[in-house]
A protein has these predicted regions:
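Surface-exposed, short loops/turns at beta-strand junctions within beta-sandwich domains
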Residues: 113-125
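Bacterial N-terminal signal peptides that target proteins for export
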Residues: 4-15
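Edge beta-strands of extracellular beta-sandwich domains
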Residues: 135-147
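Aromatic sugar-binding surface patches on proteins
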Residues: 103-116
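C-terminal segment of classical bacterial N-terminal signal peptides
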Residues: 21-31
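Short, compositionally biased P/S/T/A/G/V-rich stretches that sit at domain boundaries
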Residues: 32-69
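Aromatic/hydrophobic beta-strand junction motif of beta-rich domains
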Residues: 68-83
Length: 147
């Protein structure tokens, strides 16, 4: 009889653990399955910041800055809507390093602001390119001449 009680308790414990695991698993699955990532839909330079020119907000479709930039630092902020990969980021043909990013949106994430460090350059062409991580796998480019 003691053996039967022990087996019953062991079976009940196993079923309880299975139920808890299933419940936790379902809770996690609903958080993780938000659907496919949004394709890359836009890529823009939104701000240029330098010692000489200060912070300049860039209007969409601008081909150059209106202020003369330069000095000890030069930072460029880009806005990416959707999910991109394989970044190509250059200033006057030289690679530029990302120094930070900020999420746009929350749940779901809809894009990012990226800050790039082009310090050492006084003026020239900033180029930025990314490819969507999913269909339609489009590649988007933007560039601006920094005075």
């Amino acid at each position: 009889m003691e053996g039967d009680v022990f087996m019953f308790k062991k079976a009940a414990l196993g079923i309880s653990l299975l139920a808890i695991t299933a419940f936790v698993g379902l809770g996690m699955a609903t958080e993780a399955s938000g659907g496919p990532a949004a394709p890359l839909t836009s890529l823009n330079v939104v701000q240029v910041d330098s010692e000489q020119g200060g912070v300049e907000t860039i209007n969409p479709n601008s081909f150059s800055t209106t202020r003369d930039h330069g000095g000890k630092y030069l930072y460029i902020t880009t806005k990416e809507m959707g999910y991109g990969q394989n970044p190509f980021v250059k200033m006057n043909g030289f690679n530029v390093k990302s120094i930070g990013s900020t999420i746009i949106g929350g749940k779901p994430i809809v894009g990012w602001y990226y800050k790039w460090d082009a310090s050492g350059h006084q003026q020239g062409t900033f180029e930025y390119q990314k490819t969507s991580i999913n269909a339609p796998f489009n590649t988007m480019r933007t560039s601006i001449y920094i005075k």
